């Protein structure tokens, strides 16, 4: 058997999230069931860079699992994609894992997320399920200014889910940019790792600034409070995409 690294994309709608659960279909189940077709029916255990929630999408998720030695990268990609039909999950790249110790989760040095807000009166037709529809005009520059107070290493208790299982609320936020692209407000976040719901809670809080309901400085005050009730609501999963995962030793060849 050989350990393979996989770069995946998926439409998070219709899934209970990445992780297997009893109450519905997960992305993990789709991938591992497809892989079992290549392993004589044995279901391999996968490891993933980020356990996305229900409704959250991915354009650059990274997973690893063991498959038979006889397969090459092209065969791994094509076979898994064939067996994952008709589900909205696809292997974009497959490559041998850099080493036996390499882990999609623990070897990652950075994760990048993008959140899209459709900021117009009319509801989305083509992008429904992929954006958060906000009718009230948003002040993107004010949102960006407020976001900068969250950069650096902080206790992000105010921005993590009450169900978060991380041992520590300390995280280092490397990037949180907000910009307008026509009718879309784009929020881009980067860090080595994030707490559960951290990105969605930051977006929900910044929306209050964009609507003028919060002044810019209140975001820093919410952070300092170390209290979930001091920050804004959790943004819906629809607009969130795991864009990329970075590694010191990247398993995927770059052209």
Swiss-Prot record:
Substrate binds at residue 113. Formation of pseudouridine at positions 38, 39 and 40 in the anticodon stem and loop of transfer RNAs. PANTHER family: PSEUDOURIDYLATE SYNTHASE, TRNA PSEUDOURIDINE SYNTHASE-LIKE 1. It comes from the Bacteria. Belongs to the tRNA pseudouridine synthase TruA family. The keyword Ribosomal protein does not apply. It is an enzyme of class 5 (isomerase). Signal peptide: none annotated. The active site is at residue 53. The gene is truA. Homodimer. GO terms for molecular function: RNA binding; tRNA pseudouridine(38-40) synthase activity. Keywords: Isomerase, tRNA processing. It catalyses: uridine(38/39/40) in tRNA = pseudouridine(38/39/40) in tRNA. This is tRNA pseudouridine synthase A. SUPFAM superfamilies: Pseudouridine synthase (SSF55120).
